[in-house]
């Protein structure tokens, strides 16, 4: 695969305006079958030394899904690092919305290389727009004592839980009016599977005292055990999937169709042990605070055997609240779908 030479690293560019649409174009690049993350997350070297991907995975706002950007940035960094060590930390800033159908260009610059650690900086761009900035750190690993927090007690195994898609089908009468395109795609990804714990409570009830969301997730298309970089990038892809909604639990009842514009601002993943995303992983997510329209979500990721394999943190933007006469806030909700605009 050959890509044209692009001059230099483009300057950071602000988004022209906030993207508040909730009626997106949900298409993805036809060269990706929406199943194989090995295709979606792959990057190819260009003649200019950067890495490129033509593949797109659109979110519900019609922009590039953040997990795709995290995973592709990790793969670009791993290619530049030549597989000398696994990733131990990824720190990302999402700078502007990515546009589906426009190739991503990843410029990688080595910040540090030591005997056991190295750090690669990745800038992901579309033309003059900088979409993502990431620092990806690698560590060879060293022998040392280990400790893990215990897996939460009382969590049902994934085999006893319904998929997110099935929960939404079973609870269709609880869903607010949604555009048909959005309703058809909710929880209907073919690349990963998510099975929430206590799904109805989280999706449709408000807990004013704490924010907690537990769910099992895995990749559906097998990834070869020797493809360590891709396995880690696949967890990067998974790490943004439904995770930001954790911070909404104390604020709203129904988490779907709020009418809010939700966007990832920054995102971090720490890899503690080798991870196999083909197997079920338990995400135990909480949120300590939401303020100034920003919510922080954190999570511990457990393997099926109970080991802590990763930790996550993400700050998200929740924009569009309406304020009543008493100073309280509520989500605006979605407009009623109409046959005239093809959403019924």
Which residues does each predicted region cover?
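Terminal targeting signals and extreme-terminal segments of soluble enzymes
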Residues: 2-344
């Amino acid at each position: 695969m050959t890509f044209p030479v692009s001059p230099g690293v483009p300057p950071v560019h602000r988004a022209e305006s906030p993207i508040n649409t909730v009626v997106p174009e949900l298409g993805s690049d036809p060269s990706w079958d929406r199943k194989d993350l090995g295709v979606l997350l792959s990057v190819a070297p260009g003649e200019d030394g950067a890495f490129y991907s033509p593949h797109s995975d659109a979110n519900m706002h019609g922009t590039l899904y953040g997990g795709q950007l995290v995973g592709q940035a990790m793969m670009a960094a791993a290619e530049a690092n030549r597989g000398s060590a696994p990733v131990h930390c990824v720190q990302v800033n999402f700078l502007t919305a990515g546009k589906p159908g426009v190739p991503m260009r990843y410029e990688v610059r080595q910040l540090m290389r030591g005997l056991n650690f190295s750090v690669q900086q990745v800038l992901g761009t579309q033309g003059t727009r900088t979409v993502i900035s990431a620092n990806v750190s690698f560590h060879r690993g060293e022998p040392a004592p280990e400790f893990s927090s215990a897996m939460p007690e009382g969590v049902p195994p994934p085999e006893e839980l319904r998929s997110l898609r099935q929960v939404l089908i079973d609870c269709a009468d609880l869903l607010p009016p949604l555009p048909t395109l959005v309703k058809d795609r909710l929880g209907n990804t073919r690349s990963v599977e998510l099975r929430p714990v206590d799904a109805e409570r989280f999706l449709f009830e408000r807990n004013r005292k704490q924010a907690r969301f537990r769910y099992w997730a895995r990749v559906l298309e097998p990834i070869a055990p020797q493809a360590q970089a891709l396995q880690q990038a696949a967890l990067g892809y998974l790490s943004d999937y439904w995770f930001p909604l954790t911070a909404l639990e104390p604020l709203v009842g129904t988490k779907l169709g709020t009418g809010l514009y939700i966007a990832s601002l920054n995102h971090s993943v720490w890899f503690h042990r080798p991870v196999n995303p083909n197997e079920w992983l338990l995400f135990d997510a909480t949120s300590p605070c939401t303020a100034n329209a920003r919510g922080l979500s954190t999570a511990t990721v457990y393997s099926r055997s109970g080991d802590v394999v990763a930790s996550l943190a993400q700050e998200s933007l929740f924009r569009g609240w309406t304020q009543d006469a008493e100073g309280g806030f509520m989500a605006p909700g979605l407009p009623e779908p109409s046959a005239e605009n093809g959403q019924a």
